[in-house]
Amino acid sequence: SGERPWKCCDLQTCTKSIPAFCRCRDLLEQCSDACKECGKVRDSDPPRYICQDVYRGIPAPMCHEHE
């Protein structure tokens, strides 16, 4: 499955399969080096990006705890 393209993710969607297939919809200032497909969010100011990769494996922890 390789390296997860994000260390953490707040807006993560994963399948219920084992292993899970996960996507992260967080808006980032820049994608990580591990992200292969980085997409710019249209009309974002300042510019924001979303890693378009699908990761197969253990879901990432959340970046921020929701209170």
Swiss-Prot record:
Transmembrane segments: none
Cellular component GO terms, alphabetical: extracellular region
Family annotation (InterPro entries): Bowman-Birk_prot_inh, Prot_inh_BBI
Cystines in this chain: 8-63, 9-24, 14-22, 31-38, 35-51
Gene Ontology terms, MF aspect: serine-type endopeptidase inhibitor activity
Keywords, comma-separated and alphabetical: Disulfide bond, Protease inhibitor, Serine protease inhibitor
Site feature (Reactive bond for trypsin) residues: 16-17
SUPFAM superfamilies for this protein: Bowman-Birk inhibitor, BBI (SSF57247)
Family as reported in the entry's similarity comment: Belongs to the Bowman-Birk serine protease inhibitor family.
Annotated protein name in UniProt: Bowman-Birk type trypsin inhibitor 3
Organism ancestry: Eukaryota, Viridiplantae, Streptophyta, Embryophyta, Tracheophyta
